[in-house]
Amino acid sequence: MITSELSDFLEINEKNSVLRGISASDKILSSGICQLLFSENGHWRIPNGGTAVALFLKNSTERYYRIIVMEPSADPDWEPTVQFDFLIRDKKFETMQEHARLLVFEAESRYIGLNFYDSKECENFHNSVCKRQTRSTDKAKQPALEGKTKKKSSFFHDPFKSHREPRKQVEIEAPTDFRHVDGVKLTDVQEDLYMQVNNPEEEEIVKQLIVRNEDHIRQSLMVKKESQTVKEVKDKNKDKVKTSKSFFGRNKPKVEDVSQPIVPVITGDPLNPDWTVTAATSFKHSHTFSADPIKDPSVLLNRSTSVRVRGSLSTPRIPTHRDSYRSATKPDTVPKQTPPPTHNSYVLPHIDERMTRKMILMKNHQNLREEVLPFELEVGNYVSFPNHTHCSEKPIAEAPLRPPVRPAPIVPTSAGLCLVLAASFPTSSTPSRFLNPFPAPLPAESFFGNSKSKIAYFIKPTNEQPQELFQTPVQIEKIFSSTPSSPVSNAAIIDGMKNISLSDSSTSVAQDIAMKVPTPLPRTSKIISASSPLPPSQDEINPLIEMVDQSSSKSETQIPVTECSQSHLNGKGSAAQIQSADFDKVLNQLLSIKVNSEKSKQSADLELLLVSIEKLIQNYLGFHHED
């Protein structure tokens, strides 16, 4: 850290170089730019070094003073060059100032000179060296304060006992402006000023004094009133009550009959009082109050009653001599009114009210559980009741009953698999505050679909026999006459679709269903319109049959329902020869017709068309997977 004692003629890098050359515990007392001189044969000789910096250091840790002359370096990598280093061992060491810029001192049996650049730095350096112990020497030379004389010890004198010398009469002075506090009185002039108000200006001054010092004046009046208050005076002439001197017959205070208040008797003219009458006789009964009548214990209020007695308006209670002012000023304590009984709490004379309420709550809770339990078993949403229910809580509102959701139509296939749309699963909407501890387990399902298809299917295995939905078993046998080991070709499916004649009975039903569906699935073909919510007509089915027939004639291949290998393919061509664009186009048409057909009413012809389309979709998906 750069200190202020370093010379102002040094640059920052030179000051840092100087600090690197000294110890961290050294303190710089004075410094200056100078030139080192040695005396030889009565002449001053300049050493080989250049201009340097003279430092006067103090080290309190090692307790020494030192004079160092070093040449700082502007390069931070170089250490400063020390030209002269002298440790001061003599306490009387001093420097001599030959002229304004030259200091001379004796060291190592010869004279050393310091030729300073600035005369002020030379003077400061000289004063620091000569006055390095000024504080300690000043304290030593300062005489001690004159204290008490030393006590002499002898055989008849104890030095530990304090001895006070008698003071002379000259040392005692008369008090200045001495007055007795109790005897302070107003002079005649002051009394005239105090008693008389000559003009309105003086009256205004008095009013201002009263307003400003109101608290002090009131406090003074209260003190005077308390000092003039007459305490109870004992009458010695009254007859003493004779009591037994036994332990149980103690002296009891006599109760004075003060049923009628006694008014102080004032004799004579009030404006001209008789000063011969003592204050005790005139104020004897002025502070006597009437005592409270003794009440019968049967009349006292019971704190357990809930009726609050209100009487007529009466004067505030006057304290007696036996009561304190604090207890007399408190309002009469009236028992608190008990809260009105609740509608479902019963007050029994000899049974605890809390236990009775608990028993009633348990009974109500059991009845409520018996009423709600059959409903819970039917619906399936179990409501958890808390163990302790407060009687003031509101009853839990029952969950609204939802109409049963119609499940999606189950389409039987020849492989014994039930295909159900993922969007057709019913979603259970249970309120957040109702718990469902026993949810229905979900069946083991597997995902089946195509990356390019628009609908994903969940297939769940079933061991049940497929339900017969058609009234024409001959057509079903014609289409699904083969087993899963022998796949059905597209040509056989197309032959069955040509014999289907759609009826117009499902048109009105399809219009109602289309109002509930916000957006139909996208259709990329020009044959079926995307905005048409009606089921497919015969005109829409015929072009589709032609497209399927053409694509089947190109491949002449039978595509199985499940994943097939090259051994399952029959015909001259392979599945890879058919263009993917034709399959995508036909697949989109099949999916669109299937969705519209599911919306309409279930009829024999429409169900047969739906099964045929489903079979074609499976063939195309199986082919695409194999491709």
Swiss-Prot record:
InterPro entries xrefs: PH-like_dom_sf (IPR011993), WH1/EVH1_dom (IPR000697)
Region (Disordered): 310-347
Domain WH1: residue ranges: 21-136
Recorded GO CC terms: cytoplasm; nucleus
Name of protein: Uncharacterized protein B0280.2
